[in-house]
């Protein structure tokens, strides 16, 4: 494990060991590695509702980043499916926005279904667009709240 600031970042090997030893992660695995990544991230995000402390959010986003790092190491040259890595990094710096982002990630499951049925990769676009939409919504809200 690598320690940075207040975060503990799992190496891809450590993340793989965690996934293999954890029923929740194993239950999240689907037909392809890309679905494993998204379902694992989805399960992690849902877990935060039961313990929404900052420490838990840090741990959850560390695990999410690690799960996705495993995917990146195994999917060389398939960058389009790995867009959620940036989401995990963004979440670490924006804990206050965590739950709204969880909603956008949850919305990505429709794109995942489309990917499994058609083989067309709308998955990474959907998740990335969801976070972009959230950031845009937050910026629009700030603009509306500025005094005239």
Give residue spans per PLM region.
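A short, Lys/Arg-rich alpha-helix, primarily the initiator
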Residues: 1-28, 32, 69-95
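Short alpha-helical "recognition helix" segments of helix-turn-helix
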Residues: 28-34, 100-105
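DNA-binding alpha-helical recognition surfaces that contact promoter or target DNA
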Residues: 17, 39, 43, 86-89, ...
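Short C-terminal boundary/hinge segments that cap the last helix of small helical domains
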Residues: 62-82, 135-148
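Short, basic-rich loop-to-helix N-cap that marks the start of a DNA-contacting helix
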Residues: 48-62, 119-133
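Amphipathic alpha-helical oligomerization segments
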Residues: 92-94, 98, 105-108
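Recognition helix of helix-turn-helix/homeodomain-like DNA-binding domains
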Residues: 35-52, 107-123
